[in-house]
Amino acid sequence: MYVDLAQLEQDELCVEHEYAVGELDLEDAEIVLCAPPRVRFRLQRLGMEIRIEGRIETEIEVRCDRCLSAFRLPVRPDFDVFYAPIEVLKPEEEVELTERDLRFGFYQGERIDIDALVREQIRLALPFRLLCREDCRGLCPHCGADLNHEACRCASQEWDARWAALWDLKRRMEGV
């Protein structure tokens, strides 16, 4: 979906859009859309800059970082970004970025790619660690059992002789 900036004759334009199933590709095999994203946003012309603020609502399916089970995650990020024409970029100049500059995007011509913005905001809304639940116990590193659903199938404790000196030290310290 593109927004034609010629439609922005007034200084503001409000848009509501619900993507059709399969219309938006997240370009990431690890993230599957379960519900078509709904986007509501407002565009404002601020001189040469365009401000877009709004909200996205969708649900995605991802894999847990601990147990690798697929689970659904609601995603509802609010966003507030600025766009400027790419022509204002002067690559030969050295510029110190401010916090506001980190929320800047660039457009070419007279339209802005909203699909790219939606993809970016969905990815940014993901938590650093994707967990199916807070107390996920993960997989056994030896036998691979999902500890959320079954007990570990490997021996209770395998002795590794390389740790013998530390075990002796621990016993001596506990005995003191």
Q: In which residue ranges do the predicted regions lie?
A:
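Structured interface patches
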Residues: 1-176
